[in-house]
Amino acid sequence: MASHIVGYPRMGPKRELKFALESFWDKKSSAEDLQKVAADLRSSIWKQMADAGIKYIPSNTFSYYDQVLDTATMLGAVPPRYNFAGGEIGFDTYFSMARGNASVPAMEMTKWFDTNYHYIVPELGPEVNFSYASHKAVNEYKEAKELGVDTVPVLVGPVTFLLLSKPAKGVEKTFPLLSLLDKILPVYKEVIGELKAAGASWIQFDEPTLVLDLESHQLEAFTKAYSELESTLSGLNVIVETYFADIPAETYKILTALKGVTGFGFDLVRGAKTLDLIKGGFPSGKYLFAGVVDGRNIWANDLAASLSTLQSLEGIVGKDKLVVSTSCSLLHTAVDLVNEPKLDKEIKSWLAFAAQKVVEVNALAKALAGEKDEAFFSENAAAQASRKSSPRVTNQAVQKAAAALRGSDHRRATTVSARLDAQQKKLNLPVLPTTTIGSFPQTLELRRVRREYKAKKISEDDYVKAIKEEISKVVKLQEELDIDVLVHGEPERNDMVEYFGEQLSGFAFTANGWVQSYGSRCVKPPIIYGDVSRPNPMTVFWSQTAQSMTKRPMKGMLTGPVTILNWSFVRNDQPRFETCYQIALAIKDEVEDLEKAGINVIQIDEAALREGLPLRKAEHAFYLDWAVHSFRITNLPLQDTTQIHTHMCYSNFNDIIHSIIDMDADVMTIENSRSSEKLLSVFREGVKYGAGIGPGVYDIHSPRIPSTEEIADRINKMLAVLDTNILWVNPDCGLKTRKYAEVKPALENMVSAAKLIRTQLASAK
């Protein structure tokens, strides 16, 4: 009985790759230094899987930035602005595409399906000359082979690559990307040929777009692609891997009939309906890679339940064709529990990170083969039972309060236009008010202070003094820049979710539970293991302190319930919406306390609202209903003069704009600059929006400093579709990851651009 891993985290157990990348970008280390760290990480991952007994070990799931970018470089799909002259793509071109450079902007980055990982969006069109320009997949296969590990090279499948791309600038928006299939398949054939020549016997194509609602012509592209590749794939075993959701019934038929394919991988954690499809019929003689171990969460698998599922499949697939696998790449979970010595022992017994999931996969495969490790299974059963019965999981008062929310509407009593009038009388803001999204750069000194306070190396008084000094600097800087609505910069916060989770009951935290978000950026999601409540105020002291330093409005800064939910590892023993309602009630208590403390502008970030949207349209309405309801719960009951802002990230909002309007926030700021004003098209199409809105005027994910003219041009584009009296001027996102040398001139240019347009508007009257 065989075992398989879809993919594995790249960053390393202690984020070794992150630090190596950032050192290289800062010119503190060489390309060779970076390559050495990467090679050591790959080697240790392959060895770890081989030692654990995994039969089908993946290669080419490592990346210096992103696997879709790797595929674009493999195909030589480099936008002209990066001046790629042909040959093998090196770090300069690769990282310019990912991050931009002094003279050209980065490519767009967007969410990878409904996860918190981001991929670089390929820019394609009829003029792209595809060529085999990165031999990474073959090189990594050979590298593993030299170490004595025979791996399964993994490629993003050709159809998924095209479906995740976008038409390049200057190409018609309606350009049929799938028409490029004939142009990219010759490159795939070259790669496959080289892998075969190097000795590969298996190859994995990741085609996760198969779980989406696809149109018939899109489905036909899969049939066409694999028919075209069939002769090249001859002599290889081929896995087509899917993940993140159920496979639609029609898609299942097409997928399981693909030519040249030996095995199919399915997510059986999020795909219970797929299980029914398999039981209804599976192609004879094909392998089933059964994704029963959850790759997206940190809970130990219920091994008895997984084994039962696998046993039910044995009769359908055949014992020798059933392979135990993860539900998706382990990229989306933390790396190794061994690095968590301080985690509460009981909670720790309920968990499994990537390294432990590899062991679970192998234990299930051995159990199926009649070599069940009884002690391992008993220990797992005891942990499952302890989690079900632990008193720390349940709080009856919280359960009751959350249950009472169902079915009610919870909406502020007056309309948004009436509230905006009342707020303007109180705040007296200029036309095109300027603000920032919340965080300011976190210097090494600031991080040191927080670290030492956490380690009890400095006193609380010293810590408070240091944070107050930092807030004072940030307030002073914003006043000097003449920003209208200020923020305190969040110097006390390590992370916008962890900071709140640390002060809420029902949350646990890891020391090294890092997960890659994009590039070198990692997040450390909290673990929601029990019912959530707020024992004490969380932000009031710092917001009040900051407001006392200025006469200008100071925003209270909170993270919204849906974002806390979507950016945490969430308990899987109750529906997600129940946990979300509990968090909403905790945030509501905080909002009320901020208002009482004299904070007139409160931002409740819902950066991840869109990200939680189920992949299939049939499930959208239910999710949006409870997600939007949860947000509205947080700001009831407030005075009309209290202005509620919300902020959203990386999102294509056009399909959910009516739900966003239904959130009933007074002002919404949205990341917009990297998506070439995609958001504005919604308003061009006549959607009426009466609340304040601030589409980001510059990209904070790039070190590039935009000019006043560039920002003014962006504002003018916005004014072409939005009323002057509702438009706000702000960056895309928080400034935490940037340096002050980048932030000061960028904000200076932003304020200058707003003033320039104000003057033009005044003289045009």
Curated annotation (Swiss-Prot):
Species this chain originates from: Catharanthus roseus (Madagascar periwinkle)
Keywords for the protein's UniProt record, in alphabetical order: Amino-acid biosynthesis, Cytoplasm, Metal-binding, Methionine biosynthesis, Methyltransferase, Transferase, Zinc
Binding site for Zn(2+) 2: 658, 662
Required cofactor(s): Zn(2+)
Localization: Cytoplasm
Pfam families: Meth_synt_1, Meth_synt_2
Enzyme class: transferase
Entry EC number(s): 2.1.1.14
Record-listed 5-methyltetrahydropteroyltri-L-glutamate binding positions: 18, 116, 495, 518, 521-522, 567
UniProt miscellaneous comment: Has an absolute requirement for a polyglutamylated folate as substrate.
Binding site for Zn(2+) 1: 647, 649, 671, 733
Family named by the database record: Belongs to the vitamin-B12 independent methionine synthase family.
NCBIfam families per the UniProt record, alphabetical: met_syn_B12ind (TIGR01371), PRK05222.1 (NF003556)
Active site: 701
Positions that bind L-homocysteine: 437-439, 490, 605
InterPro entries tied to this protein: Cbl-indep_Met_Synth_N, Cobalamin-indep_Met_synthase, Met_Synth_C/arc, UROD/MetE-like_sf
GO cellular component: cytoplasm
The protein, known as: 5-methyltetrahydropteroyltriglutamate--homocysteine methyltransferase
Zinc found in the keyword field: yes
Catalysed reaction equations from the record: 5-methyltetrahydropteroyltri-L-glutamate + L-homocysteine = tetrahydropteroyltri-L-glutamate + L-methionine
UniProt superkingdom: Eukaryota
HAMAP family: Meth_synth
